[in-house]
Curated annotation (Swiss-Prot):
GO terms for molecular function: protein phosphatase activator activity. Belongs to the SMEK family. Residues 682-694, 798-809 have a biased composition (Acidic residues). This is Serine/threonine-protein phosphatase 4 regulatory subunit 3-B. GO terms for biological process: DNA damage response; regulation of double-strand break repair. It comes from Xenopus laevis (African clawed frog). It comes from the Eukaryota. InterPro entries: ARM-like, ARM-type_fold, EVH1_PP4R3, P4R3-like_central_dom, PH-like_dom_sf, PP4R3-like.
Amino acid sequence: MSDTRRRVKVYTLNEDRQWDDRGTGHVSSTYVDRLKGMSLLVRAESDGSLLLESKINPNTAYQKQQDTLIVWSEAENYDLALSFQEKAGCDEIWEKICQVQGKDPSVDVTQDPIDESEEERFEEMPETSNLIDLPTCELGKLEEIADLVTSVLSSPIRREKLALVLENEGYIKKLLQLFQTCENLDNTEGLHHLYEIIRGILFLNKAALFEVMFSDECIMDVVGCLEYDPALAQPKRHREFLTKTAKFKEVIPITDSELRQKIHQTYRVQYIQDVILPTPSVFEENFLSTLTSFIFFNKVEIVSMLQEDEKFLSEVFAQLTDEATDDDKRRELVNFFKEFCAFSQTLQPQNRDAFFKTLANLGILPALEIVMGMDDLQVRAAATDIFSYLVEFSPSMVREFVMQEAQQSDDDILLINVVIEQMICDSDPELGGAVQLMGLLRTLIDPENMLATANKTEKSEFLNFFYNHCMHVLTAPLLANTAEDKLEKDAVLGSIKTSTVCPDNFQTAQLLALILELLTFCVEHHTYHIKNYIMNKDLLRRVLILMNSKHTFLALCALRFMRRIIGLKDEFYNRYIIKGNLFEPVIHALLDNGTRYNLLNSAIIELFEFIRVEDIKSLTSHIVENFYKALESIEYVQTFKGLKTRYEQEKDRQSQKLSSVPSILRSNRFRRDARALEDDEELWFNEDDEEEGEAVVPPVEKTKPEDDFPEGYEKFLETKKAKELEDKENLPKRTSVGGFKFTFSHSVSAANGANSTNSKSVAAHTPPATSNGSSSKNTSLTTTVASTKGSLIGLVDYPDDEDEEEEEDTSPRKRPRLGS
């Protein structure tokens, strides 16, 4: 038999009775040797992988629903569905199934499975007819009918037979006529029996019966029967709610009567499932799988019908963005779109893509920009939900819109800034809306879901846009709440310092925690953009002011921000921290925390432990030299003693290097390892080159002058010229110190980083200067050097030239690269 491929979507029913999408592929029916029978195979259209392999069991009950669905159960708790793109494909596969089972393809349901014990039981009862005999539909037989319906639920074959009888004889409509009679007669006993009957029929789980029960003619009577639960003292008033309380609002008149009927039906059936029917027990869960499917595919049909009606959607958008539309009407329109987007989640991926593209083309994002700025909380909440659907569907689509918008609008009205402002101004004490919006912002600025093509890079374009136009809005509350606090540089370490402006308001603290979470995300996932911003705004210093907050969670957020920065092990950041003495507020917090063994204590110690374990030398030296006296009393962990040990080991290594180098090279010039100096400069200059080459974000509103790179660069050019002139006049001389001879290659080639032996040895082997500088003082080296500030500094300096050395601590071997 030849394979027939049809495009399908595979669904499975999960524990919550919701259909899970397992993928799109092409179905075929073929003989599988391993399964020893005809089977249904679905291969994914993306990569050809096997999505489904299911043997067509002769005893499995297959159901065909709504012309394009085939549903069946593989095991007791495993339901499957194939949703076909075309009716013809569904019909063809249905014929294959019926052919294997020996059934007429005109039926919509094949036989249910019969377990062996039940089959034997029926063989022992030859008098059992093919169909169940139903009692006549009259008041006196209601108890008998109820007993019959209840008794068949445990038997798959009897459920199927009862369903066939009910469908063929129009029995349900007769039962509903009896319901009306019982209500008119106030026949409570009869109404209780009808409740059991209708509930049992629902548990038969048959789509054909649902079509009858949920028709316009019958559904309200079905709801009426379900009001009379015998377990309740008084009947519920579900019909009153559905007809009077629940109002169907047509934001724009729906001209398609079939669509209107489908919407009414879906709402009422959902109400039956969610409100009226009791929560099913473990044994009853599978009884309502078809009801779940009925609702699911109804929603798919509603979305498809609305999407195809272009006039309807165009009119909705026109009214939504019209300034003349009153607030009540706009609220209804936004709520409609929220429901519409929620229903769209039932669509297959390719249809969902088309749906959101339709909304985008009609202008959903500019419309959201308007409604998110409204005062109505309900409207803003609905707009946020719609925005979340769009961001989840396509972050790139939203990013593209806001970047185009930035060319025509002020920063204040940009969509992302409107979203940030909504997050900042959330009036909910628990900041529920702000948390949701923060998650959406994080998705939008996440480089992991940004596209990179040959012609353009979304990441660099969008991050440039975000840091230029949006970051100042995001950080405004943080900067405002830390603006008046002045850090006391000369404060005695360990003293209690209380900030008068540090936010102690719980809601403000929560908001700042959210902002810090986003900024921490930026540190982890953005490179030079966030680095530029932190430096220009001195952001870490401002963040660490929050270590004074009485809310420990906010202090921890501030600490986490610093921990992520240190975790990058970037010397650029390390120099910034050292220069700003930014460990001071952290150590204040540790000491003020006292002997309390809490999360703050552990987090601070972990920060220092990380520095110790990773052996970050610059930070280790800074901490030990400046704070060890305050920390040495902490003995319940060995972290700080370990830092001191690391520091001393490094000093010993430098001393050993110093002892192996001739005294002529011992100079204040090399206060630290020259290689470390070169590495730092290489990092600094490379980053600057990278930033220029990648058209990085220009500095945003500088609050302090840029680092000294441009000025230093000018000094370097002046120095280089002076040095070249001097080299022409003063040739290098050979100098003798004891029995050791050393030639200084004081030439243009050396200044330009030529690989001469001597210039390399100075850079590679000169250790930090020690207190013993006498030997260099006695050296008879004669070199003429210009002594004015900013002029040339010799390769070897004398200890009394310290002031000049502070001005110029750059390795001469590295600098010439800048002038090239």
